[in-house]
From Swiss-Prot:
It comes from Methanocaldococcus jannaschii (strain ATCC 43067 / DSM 2661 / JAL-1 / JCM 10045 / NBRC 100440). This is Uncharacterized protein MJ0323. GO terms for cellular component: plasma membrane. Keywords: Cell membrane, Membrane, Transmembrane, Transmembrane helix. It is a multi-pass membrane protein. The chain crosses the membrane at residues 1-21, 28-48. It is found in: Cell membrane. It comes from the Archaea.
Protein backbone atom coordinates (compact mmCIF):
# COMPACT_ATOMS: atom_id res chain seq x y z
CA UNK A 1 0.00 0.00 0.00
CA UNK A 2 1.41 3.34 -1.10
CA UNK A 3 0.57 6.68 0.44
CA UNK A 4 0.84 9.67 -1.87
CA UNK A 5 1.48 13.10 -0.42
CA UNK A 6 1.37 16.32 -2.37
CA UNK A 7 3.02 19.47 -1.11
CA UNK A 8 1.66 22.82 -2.22
CA UNK A 9 3.85 25.88 -1.75
CA UNK A 10 1.73 28.87 -0.75
CA UNK A 11 3.54 32.21 -0.43
CA UNK A 12 3.44 33.66 3.07
CA UNK A 13 2.73 37.19 1.89
CA UNK A 14 1.94 39.04 -1.29
CA UNK A 15 3.30 42.59 -1.36
CA UNK A 16 1.64 45.07 -3.69
CA UNK A 17 3.66 48.22 -4.37
CA UNK A 18 0.83 50.71 -4.83
CA UNK A 19 3.01 53.64 -5.92
CA UNK A 20 4.57 51.63 -8.77
CA UNK A 21 1.22 51.14 -10.54
CA UNK A 22 1.24 54.69 -11.91
CA UNK A 23 5.04 55.09 -11.56
CA UNK A 24 4.58 58.76 -10.72
CA UNK A 25 6.42 59.72 -7.53
CA UNK A 26 5.15 63.34 -7.39
CA UNK A 27 1.43 62.66 -7.83
CA UNK A 28 0.67 61.19 -4.44
CA UNK A 29 2.06 59.26 -1.54
CA UNK A 30 1.08 55.64 -1.12
CA UNK A 31 2.15 53.10 1.44
CA UNK A 32 2.66 49.42 0.79
CA UNK A 33 1.45 46.75 3.16
CA UNK A 34 1.64 43.00 2.84
CA UNK A 35 -1.51 40.99 2.28
CA UNK A 36 -1.42 37.65 4.04
CA UNK A 37 -3.99 34.93 4.45
CA UNK A 38 -6.47 36.20 7.02
CA UNK A 39 -5.31 39.82 6.98
CA UNK A 40 -5.81 42.02 3.96
CA UNK A 41 -4.05 45.22 5.05
CA UNK A 42 -4.52 48.94 4.68
CA UNK A 43 -3.96 51.40 1.88
CA UNK A 44 -3.29 55.03 2.74
CA UNK A 45 -3.73 57.41 -0.19
CA UNK A 46 -2.99 61.11 0.00
CA UNK A 47 -4.69 63.31 -2.59
CA UNK A 48 -2.48 64.29 -5.54
CA UNK A 49 -3.97 67.75 -5.99
CA UNK A 50 -2.07 70.54 -4.16
CA UNK A 51 -5.41 72.02 -3.08
CA UNK A 52 -6.46 68.75 -1.45
CA UNK A 53 -2.98 68.27 0.02
CA UNK A 54 -3.14 71.67 1.71
CA UNK A 55 -6.59 70.87 3.09
CA UNK A 56 -5.31 67.58 4.50
CA UNK A 57 -7.57 65.25 2.54
CA UNK A 58 -6.52 61.61 2.58
CA UNK A 59 -8.26 58.28 2.62
CA UNK A 60 -7.57 55.02 4.39
CA UNK A 61 -9.31 51.95 3.04
CA UNK A 62 -9.35 48.25 3.77
CA UNK A 63 -9.43 46.51 0.38
CA UNK A 64 -10.89 43.06 -0.06
CA UNK A 65 -8.42 40.65 -1.61
CA UNK A 66 -9.51 39.66 -5.11
CA UNK A 67 -12.57 41.89 -5.30
CA UNK A 68 -13.54 43.59 -8.55
CA UNK A 69 -14.15 46.86 -6.72
CA UNK A 70 -10.58 46.87 -5.37
CA UNK A 71 -9.07 46.09 -8.79
CA UNK A 72 -11.19 48.74 -10.51
CA UNK A 73 -10.38 51.34 -7.87
CA UNK A 74 -6.67 50.70 -8.37
CA UNK A 75 -7.06 51.30 -12.12
CA UNK A 76 -9.03 54.49 -11.50
CA UNK A 77 -6.39 55.68 -9.02
CA UNK A 78 -3.59 55.08 -11.53
CA UNK A 79 -5.55 56.80 -14.31
CA UNK A 80 -6.25 59.84 -12.14
CA UNK A 81 -2.59 60.03 -11.15
CA UNK A 82 -1.55 60.03 -14.81
CA UNK A 83 -4.09 62.75 -15.64
CA UNK A 84 -2.94 64.84 -12.69
CA UNK A 85 0.68 64.43 -13.74
CA UNK A 86 0.02 65.43 -17.35
CA UNK A 87 -2.24 68.40 -16.58
CA UNK A 88 -0.59 69.56 -13.37
CA UNK A 89 -3.90 69.60 -11.51
Amino acid sequence: MFLALTSIAIPAAIVIPISLIANLPNCGISLTFSMTIGFVGLILTIAASPVFKNCGFSSMTCPVLGSNFFNNSMNVHATCAVCAWKTGV
